């Protein structure tokens, strides 16, 4: 994945109470992605992968794919993915309005090198993608298709199909609808369910 945010400053638009918490408690709080303004995007990403895999499959493989996705989404839908949103844009009117208490909040500048140290072994910093073409060319697509067509999972790399789907679910949090593209978003993403395994 692209790290075009590396070495740059990242900006977090928020209210004064969040600023107090960040400074006073020396903490960054992540939100459950399903509680954010783009909660449907995770399911949309999974459906995009499903649709792409189904193209060109036999009827039996098509049914197997849909059954597998239904089972996996049922397993994962309550697994939390937490994120904190940043932007590459320092002074963006839309984000002031949307995230900084209608322009009466703050825009905090963060150093990416320090954020990477904070996130090490606990969370990832990922650029957000706004196009489904990226999702349609994702590695998950080929891994799941290989499982559907050949019953194969690279056990050394992944262990089993559940691990591939868990990773796919986590990645779904960095895909958003193209209407948000102007935000130039980068996210810290944490997966507590993945840390347990």
Each language-model region and where it sits:
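Partner-binding and oligomerization surfaces adjacent to conserved cores of proteins
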Residues: 1-197
């Amino acid at each position: 994945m692209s790290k075009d945010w590396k070495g740059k400053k990242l900006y977090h638009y928020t209210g004064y109470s969040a600023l107090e918490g960040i400074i006073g408690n020396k903490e960054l709080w992540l939100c459950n992605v399903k509680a954010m303004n783009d909660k449907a995007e995770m399911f949309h990403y999974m459906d995009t992968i499903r649709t792409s895999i189904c193209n060109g499959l036999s009827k039996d493989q098509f049914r197997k794919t849909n059954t597998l996705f239904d089972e996996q989404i049922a397993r994962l839908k309550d697994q939390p993915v937490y994120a904190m949103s940043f932007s590459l844009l320092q002074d963006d009117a839309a984000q002031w309005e949307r995230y900084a208490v209608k322009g009466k909040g703050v825009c905090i500048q963060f150093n990416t090198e320090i954020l990477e140290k904070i996130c090490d072994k606990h969370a990832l910093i990922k650029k957000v993608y706004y196009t489904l073409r990226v999702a349609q060319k994702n590695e998950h697509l080929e891994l799941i298709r290989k499982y559907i067509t050949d019953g194969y999972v690279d056990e050394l790399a992944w262990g089993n199909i559940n691990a591939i789907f868990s990773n796919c679910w986590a990645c779904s949090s960095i895909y958003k609808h193209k209407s948000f593209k102007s935000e130039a978003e980068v996210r810290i993403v944490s997966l507590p369910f993945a840390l347990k395994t």
